[in-house]
Amino acid sequence: MNIRNLLNDRVKSAMNDAGIPADYSPHLAVSKKAGFGDYQANGAMGAAKALKTNPREVAQKIIDNLDLNGIASKVEIAGPGFINIHLDPKWLAQQTVAVTNSTNLGILPKNNPETVVIDYSSPNLAKEMHVGHLRSTIIGDAIARVLEFTGDKVIRQNHVGDWGTQFGMLIAELEDQLGSGERPELALQDLEGFYQQAKKHFDDDPAFADRARDYVVKLQSGDAQVNKLWQEFRRVSLLHAEEIYRKLNVTLGEADVRGESAYNDDLAPVVAELEAQGLAVEDQGAKVVFLHELADKNGDPSVAIIQKKDGGYLYSTSDLAALRYRVGTLKANRILYFIDARQSLHMQQVFTLARKAGFADEWLSTEHHAFGTMLGSDGKPFKTRSGGTVKLAQLLDEAVERAAKEVRTKNPDLTEEEMAEVASKVGIGAVKYADLCKTRTNDYVFNWESMLAFEGNTGPYMQYAYTRIRSIFRRANENMDTFESEVNLTEPQEVQLAIKLLQLPEIVEQIAADAYPHVMCNYLYDLASLFMTFYEACPILKEGVEPAVKTSRLQLSKGVARTLAQGLDLLGIEVMEKM
């Protein structure tokens, strides 16, 4: 049950009955100031301007036709024509019981679910995953979870970099190490070191470099032995990535991997088709497309190179092939790409060219959801102290170690097994939440102290709020999972908490449309903060609290806990019974 949509539909119907043209919107939103109702409809002003009449008169006509019987306790006009809607506590109480006892917390599946392809993570298999891969991986995964929760069919695509000239060098190095008796898993246990060693041999040994270049040709022509070595390198590299995904609690699996190599046979046909349509032309030996739709301020067209002078293909070619596959084979209605902001022009070129070539229909939604960079305290891209790339595995291990110290200080009574579980969930959750709570398009500064804090808008604070409610139920000798009670909202803190609790469907709907996970973080923080205020003002377990009041407040608390757990789960963050 989506309160905003319900009220919007009722106000829209009232506007129609009041004779207001259908193209005017109710402009319904959550009220930002206390005393101005719980929701506010601001459409009267725009309609009045067009109708050349007094906005308060228009607002009154809307109210005269507005049916919110049993939903609102009061509807009033404020200022120049704002319509303030005060929700009825009795109705809120009924909705709270229904929602907190429902399977999906009142979120109904879509009437018309879409097939959504999401391209995210997509590391280069030649190297270990580093912090630069974190944002795409966890933001993309959060949106995949949200869209599945709404009922969409989500197809994850991990477009890994498993092809290219560097693989000749890596295969030659792997062959040398296997020839000396090394097992693939051991040879590649340090992917970064392996890459550096291969690069050194390539730079220092002309014979090795010649063999590496020869292997590129053989790999591209389908040589069985070289292909076998490449498959082995790819297999072990993917195991590295899958271990990171497991630590991060990310839903990507082996079945979601469809790398650049999957499109090898499609590249030449894509170029040929673009040439046949007159879109691709030869320019200085290369094959390019001039995109006047993306012209610069001087009117010069944007140039997309689809085949190099030496016959090699580029990312734009494989991305076009991938997009055509996602439309033609996967039958996508919507395609989302989580790739950093530096690739914005590239993605615009791919989308524009795909439509010009007929690979994607005009109605298809192709969306590049860009993101900023993780920065160090110096304001520069996050690096090691020596200036090297920070490996993601090392970052996550350090997060768990730091979390263990914090948790051990706060709760030394935990068993070693409990400590390990809590430290893992708190540490990984802290890293993910610190990233996801920032507006996706902004850069942000990585800071251990703030992300592991147990107060403020942090992962540990959200997890703590959940465990605190679990603790309340244990002290009440009640099983939260099976507990059910009527709700009676008499105190303002109860009413405000119930309203916030019931707004989850609005939040999920917004994230599904805009792909900004920080909206969920802000919502959960507001919910947790309102719960703490409610808990201080409205006793639950104190002596003298009437049984009906106690059970009502326990039911409200259960709703908060379930919403916190669900919201965090949609972000890929786990909760625990105690911490």
From Swiss-Prot:
Cite the InterPro entries for this sequence: aa-tRNA-synth_I_CS, Arg-tRNA-ligase, Arg-tRNA-synth_N, Arg-tRNA-synth_N_sf, ArgRS_core, DALR_anticod-bd, Rossmann-like_a/b/a_fold, tRNAsynth_Ia_anticodon-bd
| Sorted UniProt keywords | Aminoacyl-tRNA synthetase, ATP-binding, Cytoplasm, Ligase, Nucleotide-binding, Protein biosynthesis
Would the keyword Zinc-finger be found if you checked this record's keyword annotation? no
Which terms in the GO cellular component ontology are assigned? cytoplasm
Q: Which reaction does it catalyse?
A: tRNA(Arg) + L-arginine + ATP = L-arginyl-tRNA(Arg) + AMP + diphosphate
Q: Where is this motif: 'HIGH' region?
A: 123-133
* Subunit structure, interactors included: Monomer.
NCBIfam families in alphabetical order: argS
- The entry's protein name is Arginine--tRNA ligase
Q: Which organism is it from?
A: Saccharophagus degradans (strain 2-40 / ATCC 43961 / DSM 17024)
